[in-house]
Curated annotation (Swiss-Prot):
One of its GO terms (biological process) is glycyl-tRNA aminoacylation. NCBIfam families: glyS (TIGR00211). It catalyses: tRNA(Gly) + glycine + ATP = glycyl-tRNA(Gly) + AMP + diphosphate. Belongs to the class-II aminoacyl-tRNA synthetase family. It comes from the Bacteria. Pfam families: DALR_1, tRNA_synt_2f. InterPro entries: DALR_anticod-bd, Gly-tRNA-synth_bsu, Gly-tRNA-synth_heterodimer. Its EC number is 6.1.1.14. It is found in: Cytoplasm. This is Glycine--tRNA ligase beta subunit.
C-alpha cells in the first residue's frame, strides 16, 4: 500500500521543541486522515535540528465510496421543510428522492446520497498546507519580504523546503501538489549544513533514510542519543574514567547535532578543588558537555563523587584535524568558566552565612507575602516548634532554618540557581556548623518530586516541614491556590512533600494546629482557609496512596470523619480498613451496611426526619433484633476504645464481628413492620448500625 513521506526543512529548531513538534506533526496528520476516513498501518515522526519528518505507512490510494440514506419530511409537509431537505441533501427536486412508508409515521421522503471516495493525494494536498500554517509551535516567527503580508506563514525558524511524496514502494511516488507561502512541495531536501550541504532528491521513505545518512544526517533522535552515549562511554573507558550520565543533557545535545561526533577535552586539575557539583553545572550549562568521574573515591570527599579533569563534548562536525581545534576551543571556554566559578567559590567563603542574612531583606519572595528575610523568621519559628515532634534539637532546627536561605545571596547561587541549598551546605560545613545544620540547609528543599529522596535527619525534616507549610499557608492566606492544571508556585508538590516527610519520619503532626501556627506567622486567621487546605492535603494523600496501590475511596471514608488531620493515623486507618474489606467478613459487613443505609435513606425521606435515636430493647419482638442490638453495643464500644488507643486493626476486628448478627437480622426481620412503633424501633436499630461503623470510617464513601 502507498506511503506518505513529509519533511519540513528549516533553520535550526530549538532542541527543547523538537520532540514535541515531531509528535504534534504525527498526531495532526494522522488525526486529519482518520477524520476523513483514511486508515493507515503505522506512522512515525522524526526530528533533527533542521527538519521535522513524518512517515505514514499503509494508506489507501483513495477513500471508500460512501452511500448515505438521509431521512426527510413527511409527504405533504410544508414547502419550507421540503426545500430545506432538498438543499441539505443536494437534490434538485423530489423526483430524486424515494418515498418510504412507515406503518406508524406514514410516508416520508428519503434521499440516497452517494459520494465517491476521494483520491488520497487530493486529500493530502488539502490537509498538509493547513496543518503547516496552523502548526502549534510554542514560539514562532515570520521572515522575509512576505512577512508583512496578512496571513503570512509563521514557523519556529525560517522554513526553506518541503518534501511531500505519496505512492507505493513498487512504483514511483507522486509529489503531493501544494504550496505554502511560495514554498512548493517537492522531492528535494538537503544534507548536513557543512559536511554535505547540497540538494538531495528523495522519492520514498526507504530511500530517504540512507540518502540522509550519506549526507551526514542521522534522522532518528534516539539513534543520535545512542551514538553519543556509546562513543562517550568508549572514550571514558579508554582513559580509565567513568561517564557521569545525564539524560536531560543527552536529550538536549542530541537535538543540537545532526551528525554527532564525540570528543574529549581536559582542564587544569587545580579546578578540582571546586565542589564537583559546581564543575558539573558550569560545564553542563555553558558548554553542554558531560563530566567524567575518577575511578577511585577521594577519602576527603565525604562520600561525594570525585570528578576527573576531563569532559566529553559533542560536535556536529567531523573535522579534518580529528577535532583538535574544536577541543581546544571548548577547553578555552571551559577554563574561563571554571575560573569564574573558582572566583565565586573563594569569594563566597570569605563571608559567613549569618552575615549575609540582612541582604535577604532585599529579595522579595512574593509581592503579597513579603521578603525572604521575613520568610526566614517564620520558618525558623516553625522549625523550632516542629523539632520535638520529629525528634530534632530545637536550637539546631532554628539555626538551620535561619541559615537555610542565606546562600541565595552568594555569587555562586546567583550564577547557578539550581545549586541553592547545596552551596549553603558547603559554606556551612566550612564555617564549622554542626553536620545536622549543614545537612538541613541542603535538604530542606526536598523532596522536589515524587521520585526524589525524602530527608531522614530530624533537623532536616523539621526545617523542610516548616518551609513547605509556611509556603502553603502563605499562598492560601492570599488566595493564590492551584487551579486546574495551573500551579505556578508548585503547591501540589509542597503538599505532597509534607505528606512524604510526615510519613517517612513517622511523625505525629496534626495538621490543623500546624496550619494555625503557620498562619500566625503571616498574621492570618486560619479559620477562613484551614478546611480548604486540609481538603487539598486529602487530595494529595489520595494521589500518594493510590500510587502505592491504595483505594482513593477509603481515604475519602476516613477523611469524612471529623478531626482527621493526623496524616500518620489517617494512613494507618486506611490501611486497616483496606485489610478489613479484603476479608469475607468485611465484604459482607459492607453489603449489610449498604442495605441498612438504603432502607434508611428511603424511609427517612418518606418520614422527613433521621432515625438516629436509640432503639428500645423492650420493643424487640425477635431474638435477631436483640442479638444485633447487643452486638452493636459491644462492637461500637470496642471499636471506639481501640481507635482511642490507635489500635485500628482491633477496631476493624470489632466491626467484623457484626457480620453474623447483621446477616441474621436481614434474613429473619422485616424492617417495615405493620406496627408503626415496631417499624420505628427497627429503623433505629439500623441507625445504630450506621453509627457504629462511624467509629472507624464513613462507610457511605466506600465504593465497589
Amino acid at each position: 500500500m502507498p506511503d506518505l513521506l513529509l519533511e519540513l526543512f528549516s533553520e535550526e529548531i530549538p532542541a527543547r521543541m523538537q520532540r514535541r513538534a515531531a509528535e504534534d506533526l504525527r498526531k495532526l496528520v494522522t488525526d486529519a486522515l482518520v477524520e476523513r476516513g483514511f486508515l493507515y498501518e503505522g506512522a512515525k515522526a522524526f526530528s533533527t535540528p533542521r527538519r521535522l519528518a513524518l512517515h505514514v505507512a499503509g494508506l489507501p490510494v483513495r477513500g471508500q465510496d460512501v452511500r448515505e440514506e438521509r431521512k426527510g419530511p413527511r409527504v405533504g409537509a410544508p414547502e419550507a421543510a421540503v426545500q430545506g431537505f432538498l438543499k441539505s441533501a443536494g437534490l434538485a427536486s423530489l423526483d430524486q428522492a424515494r418515498v418510504v412508508a412507515d406503518p406508524k409515521k406514514g410516508e416520508f421522503y428519503v434521499a440516497v446520497i452517494e459520494r465517491p471516495g476521494r483520491e488520497t493525494l487530493d486529500v493530502l494536498a488539502e490537509i498538509l498546507p493547513a496543518i503547516i500554517r496552523a502548526f502549534p509551535w510554542p514560539k514562532s516567527m515570520r521572515w522575509g519580504a512576505a512577512s508583512a503580508e496578512p496571513g503570512a506563514l509563521r514557523w519556529v525558524r525560517p522554513l526553506h523546503a518541503i518534501v511531500a511524496t505519496f505512492g507505493p514502494e513498487t512504483e514511483t511516488p507522486e509529489r503531493v501538489p501544494f504550496r505554502v507561502d511560495g514554498i512548493e512541495a517537492g522531492f528535494t531536501t538537503y544534507g548536513h549544513r557543512f559536511l554535505s550541504p547540497g540538494p538531495i532528491e528523495v522519492r520514498r521513505f526507504a530511500d530517504y533514510l540512507p540518502a540522509l545518512e550519506r549526507a551526514k544526517v542521522v534522522l532518528d533522535a534516539d539513534r543520535r542519543k545512542d551514538i553519543i552515549l556509546h562513543d562517550a562511554r568508549d572514550l571514558a573507558f579508554a582513559r580509565g574514567l567513568d561517564l557521569v550520565e545525564d539524560e536531560g543533557l543527552l536529550e538536549e545535545v542530541a537535538g543540537l547535532v545532526e551528525w554527532p561526533v564525540t570528543l574529549m577535552g581536559a582542564f587544569d586539575a587545580s579546578f578540582l578543588d571546586i565542589p564537583p557539583e559546581v564543575i558539573r553545572a558550569t560545564i553542563r550549562a555553558n558548554q553542554k558537555c558531560f563530566v567524567l568521574r575518577a575511578p577511585a573515591a577521594d577519602p576527603a570527599a565525604k562520600g561525594r563523587e570525585r570528578l576527573a579533569n576531563a569532559f566529553i563534548l559533542v560536535s556536529n562536525l567531523a573535522a579534518s584535524d580529528g577535532g583538535a581545534a574544536i577541543v581546544a576551543g571548548n577547553e578555552r571556554v571551559v577554563r574561563a568558566r571554571l575560573s569564574d566559578a573558582k572566583f565565586f567559590w573563594e569569594t563566597d567563603r570569605k563571608i559567613p552565612l549569618a552575615e549575609r542574612l540582612p541582604k535577604l531583606d532585599d529579595i522579595v519572595f512574593h509581592e503579597k507575602l513579603g521578603t525572604q528575610a521575613a520568610r526566614v523568621g517564620r520558618i525558623a519559628a516553625l522549625a523550632r516548634a516542629f523539632a520535638p515532634v520529629v525528634g530534632a534539637d530545637p536550637a539546631e532546627a532554628e539555626r538551620a532554618a535561619r541559615l537555610a536561605k542565606a546562600d541565595l545571596v552568594t555569587e555562586m547561587v546567583g550564577e547557578f540557581p539550581e545549586l541553592q541549598g547545596l552551596m549553603g551546605r558547603y559554606y556551612a560545613e566550612l564555617q564549622g556548623e554542626p553536620e545536622a545544620v549543614a545537612a538541613a540547609i541542603e535538604e530542606h528543599y526536598k523532596p522536589l518530586g515524587p521520585g526524589d529522596r525524602v530527608p531522614t535527619g530530624p533537623v532536616s525534616v523539621a526545617v523542610a516541614l516548616a518551609d513547605k507549610l509556611d509556603t502553603l499557608v502563605g499562598f492560601w492566606s492570599v488566595d493564590e491556590k492551584p487551579t486546574g492544571s495551573k500551579d505556578p508556585y508548585a503547591l501540589r508538590r509542597a503538599a505532597l512533600g509534607v505528606i512524604r516527610l510526615v510519613l517517612g519520619a513517622g511523625a505525629r503532626l496534626p495538621l490543623l494546629p500546624a496550619l494555625a501556627a503557620a498562619a500566625g506567622g503571616h498574621g492570618a486567621a486560619p479559620g477562613g482557609f484551614a478546611a480548604d487546605l486540609l481538603g487539598f492535603f486529602a487530595d494529595r494523600l489520595k494521589v500518594h496512596l493510590r500510587d502505592q496501590g491504595a483505594r482513593h475511596d477509603l481515604i475519602d471514608a476516613v477523611f469524612a470523619l471529623p478531626g482527621q488531620d493526623d496524616l500518620l493515623l489517617v494512613v494507618r486507618r486506611v490501611e486497616a480498613l483496606g485489610r478489613l474489606l479484603d476479608t469475607e467478613d468485611g465484604t459482607n459487613l459492607l453489603a449489610g451496611y449498604r442495605r441498612a443505609a438504603n432502607i434508611l435513606r428511603i424511609e427517612e425521606k418518606k418520614d422527613g426526619r433521621a432515625h438516629d435515636g436509640a432503639p428500645d430493647p423492650a420493643r424487640f419482638a425477635l431474638p435477631e433484633e436483640t442479638a444485633l442490638a447487643e452486638a452493636l453495643a459491644a462492637a461500637r464500644g470496642a471499636a471506639e476504645r481501640a481507635v482511642a488507643a490507635e489500635d485500628f486493626e482491633g477496631a476493624m476486628r470489632a466491626l467484623a464481628g457484626l457480620r453474623a448478627p447483621v446477616d441474621a437480622f436481614f434474613d429473619k426481620v422485616t424492617v417495615n413492620a405493620e406496627d408503626p412503633a415496631m417499624r420505628e424501633n427497627r429503623l433505629a436499630l439500623l441507625g445504630a448500625l450506621r453509627t457504629a461503623t462511624l467509629a472507624v470510617a464513613d462507610f457511605s464513601r466506600i465504593e465497589g
